[in-house]
Amino acid sequence: MNPNMPPRLCSQRGNALVEFALVLPLLLLIFAGIVDFGFLFQRYEVITNAAREGARIGVLPGYDEAAVQQRVLDYVQAGLSMSAGDAVAALTPPPDVDTVMLAAGTGAPFAATQVTVSFTYNYLIIGPIVNLVTGGDWTASITINSRSTMRREIVGS
């Protein structure tokens, strides 16, 4: 510090504010990323549970492919607050195909069918936050895929 400088120029007041102003955007971006990852994880859990719920319904007698798809879409709509047009659900194969004969523990044969429910969801990464700051139309997304397979067992078939 030069003793000939006026005290006003030698003051340290305001340094912390300037440093905070320089670091704040980075801290906000990190915080937004943490929040966005939380939303992504929540979406993944809903998609996974929806596929599992669809497979669970698919192995029950009396339910067809349309009922399974509707159950999955209802679960996703309730969990993600989205419209039916935003979701894509696929049931492969339908519950009444690909029958395989297995031996049950009692020795009686029974038919088993694999029911697989797949669900795909596109998640927009930090898009609303980036669009708010830039005023642009940024649309980077992650595709979340979930698949659940359960076995339908029909004793005595």
Region roles according to the model:
Residues 2-3, 56-157:
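Short, conserved structural patches
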Residues 2-76:
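Alpha-helical assembly-interface signal, strongest on the long, hydrophobic N-terminal helix that forms
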